[in-house]
Curated annotation (Swiss-Prot):
Keyword Membrane: no
InterPro entries given in the database record: G_ENGA, GTP-bd, GTPase_Der, KH_dom-like, KH_dom-like_a/b, P-loop_NTPase, Small_GTP-bd
Domain EngA-type G: 3-167, 189-364
Entry keyword annotation includes Repeat: yes
Lineage: Bacteria, Pseudomonadati, Pseudomonadota, Alphaproteobacteria, Hyphomicrobiales
Name this protein carries in UniProt: GTPase Der
Subunit composition and interactions: Associates with the 50S ribosomal subunit.
Organism for this UniProt entry: Rhodopseudomonas palustris (strain BisA53)
Binding, GTP 2: 195-202, 242-246, 307-310
């Protein structure tokens, strides 16, 4: 693992803004409301030629025993243990508060190098607050504005003084396009876990990790950010994104929840396989179908996990009934894997991880040309394309354009005249023939150029 900095401090001093600035992406939610960050978040940061790991943490605040606030503090303490050095961030405009002083003592007791960061230092008020911080005894403050990108050269100097010299032999380029199929297969599978609020997404990931890495609570909406964690499951690497619960747009009122939903949608777009988690006590609802449709439109492989299976009375045929219901409501991903699980009890985890691996393999599938041609001839022979305006449509040949998801191009005489119903027939036929369950299959129509179109007709 690379050199690791944990960003700590009281709530709303700009820790997540600094995290986003150094990571170069908007990975952490940022809002003026204190306490937006709850789980600890990790990302790969870069500053000049320096590369490092960053851990963004919840604001250090006191909380009652067993409360969500106390568990947020435990997450912060874990981040400090994992870090090689700490960035203690305070709001220079606001000046030092009693909480800043208390948690400066906390940082000192960690017995790790500390970089004192005076954020929001722009303007006279910021300079005065930065000078005040010498009283903390943590050395010279690095004056920055995370929002405006000011002071980063001084922060670079502070990082450079703590970090070891880079190992030139260890430098690698994770360029997906340049990887062989074998190398690509060894990359971590990117998995997003989505669903309605309180479906048990974080509980499931905690069981995979064997620790309470993500905060859980009976209260819906505990998770706000999309949190990424690395999981080694039986020798296979996964990068799993826990996301905020997705509810109907009409029910999304608070600004923070709107930000959380947007964050979850970004996680779906970044993932390769998406696990849609249902609650076994409520099963399919309209919002679940909307989420599944979004996943299909984004071209991601889909697995359905029916969680809290330990809370329902079991009887033969339950999964079969769910399969029938899923195929009825989600024909665009017919045959999607459905796995019954209990995140709390650890039931069905092996089946779920196997389903994710299988779906990933299907999503990456390339069909041999000879087999593709055999399917194409058989599909047209079984159900010839219809006549439109008295003229028979001619489908010439098919080729696979790409995988991830499997996408094909059918060359034909009049692309705009092919009915949508016939295109659906081709998609379903291809999916069944090559066994591509639960992954989007794309077929695009393209007109074959007429080689005689440019020649002038001879006079009779």
């Amino acid at each position: 693992m690379s050199f690791t900095f944990a960003i700590i401090g009281r709530p709303n001093v700009g820790k997540s803004t600094l995290f986003n600035r150094l990571v170069g992406q908007k990975l952490a939610l940022v809002d003026d409301t204190p306490g937006v960050t709850r789980d600890r978040r990790e990302g790969e940061g870069r500053l000049g030629d320096l590369e490092f790991t960053l851990i963004d943490t919840a604001g250090l605040d006191e909380g009652a025993k067993g409360s969500l606030t106390e568990r947020m503090q435990q997450q912060t303490e874990t981040a400090i243990e994992l870090a090689d050095a700490l960035m203690f961030v305070f709001d220079a405009r606001a000046g030092l508060t009693p909480n800043d002083r208390a948690f400066a003592d906390f940082a000192r007791r960690a017995n790790k190098p500390v970089i004192l960061v005076a954020n929001k230092s722009e303007g006279k008020a910021g300079e005065i607050g930065a000078m005040e911080s010498y009283a903390l005894g943590l050395g010279d403050p690095v004056q920055i504005s995370a929002e405006h990108g000011e002071g980063l050269s001084e922060l670079y100097d502070a990082f450079r003084a703590l970090m070891p010299e880079p190992d030139e032999e260890a430098e690698e380029d994770d360029d997906v396009e340049g990887l062989t199929e074998e190398e690509f297969s060894k990359r971590p599978i990117r998995v997003a876990i989505v669903g309605r609020p309180n479906a048990g997404k974080s509980t499931m990931i905690n069981h995979l990790l064997g620790e309470e890495r993500l905060l859980t609570s009976p209260e819906a909406g505990t998770t706000r950010d999309s949190i990424a964690v690395s999981v080694d499951y039986k020798g296979r690497q996964f990068r799993i994104f826990d996301t905020a619960g997705l509810r109907r747009r009409s029910r999304i009122e608070e600004k923070l929840e709107k930000l959380s939903v947007a964050d979850a949608l970004r996680a779906v777009r970044f993932a390769e396989v998406v696990v849609l988690m249902l609650d076994a006590q409520t099963k399919f609802e309209e919002q679940d179908l909307r989420i599944a449709d979004l996943i299909e439109r984004e071209g991601r492989a889909l697995v359905i996990a029916v969680n809290k299976w330990d809370l329902v009375e079991r009887h033969p045929g339950q999964i079969g009934a769910l399969r029938t219901e899923a195929d009825h409501w989600l024909p665009q991903v017919k045959g999607v894997p459905i796995v019954a699980v209990s995140g709390l009890m650890g039931e069905g985890i092996d089946r779920l991880m196997s389903a994710i691996e299988d779906s990933y393999a299907t999503w990456n599938r390339r069909v041999p040309t000879a087999a593709l041609n055999r399917w194409f001839e058989q599909a047209i022979q079984t159900n010839p394309p219809p006549a439109v305006s008295g003229r028979r449509l001619k489908l010439n040949y098919v080729t696979q354009a790409k995988a991830r998801p499997p996408s094909f191009i059918v060359f034909c005489s009049r692309a705009d005249a092919v009915p949508e119903s016939y295109l659906r027939y081709l998609v379903n036929s291809l999916r069944n023939y090559f066994e591509l369950p639960g992954t989007p299959v794309r077929i695009m129509l393209r007109e074959k150029a007429n080689p005689f179109a440019h020649k002038r007709k001879r006079p009779s």
